[in-house]
Amino acid sequence: MDIYDSVRNIIANIERVPSTTQEGIAPIGRAAQWSRYTGITVESVVDTVVEACEQEAKRLGIPVVIAIVDASGSLVYQRRMERALGVSIELAPNKAYTAVAFRCGTEKLGAVVQPGTPLYGIETMVKRPIVLFGGGEPLMLENHLIGGLGISGGTVKEDVLIVN
């Protein structure tokens, strides 16, 4: 299965997500249920993730905005480093949301939505802003999506270095 097949499957599942599963658990409820058993939530990893991103941004000498969303795409944390670009305040959370919505990095998604591909124009078909260049990654823990991370402020290459 190539990346195109993976993203097509993700899109198909997004369109068909039921309000509840056969077990009667809402999909987001399943993530919450997993969190109750493990004690691991996106909020519990925020400090670690932010510290790692800030250290890398400082090492590169790039002021950035760091945004973290939960598994539903809701913003749980945002920090703007001194001198970070103003537009990054919007881009970072949108990158994090995109990573959660498609369950893949924004750089990978951008590669499969180019003209001539089956997903071309997907960003115009949804209400929330979708970012199609690097800087957003899903936060996975034990094969569970717990949230998304968005970095904005440097070049795309620099944002990708920091987010990874």
Segments the model singles out, each with a brief description of its role:
Residues 2-164:
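Flexible, solvent-exposed loop/hinge segments and secondary-structure transition points
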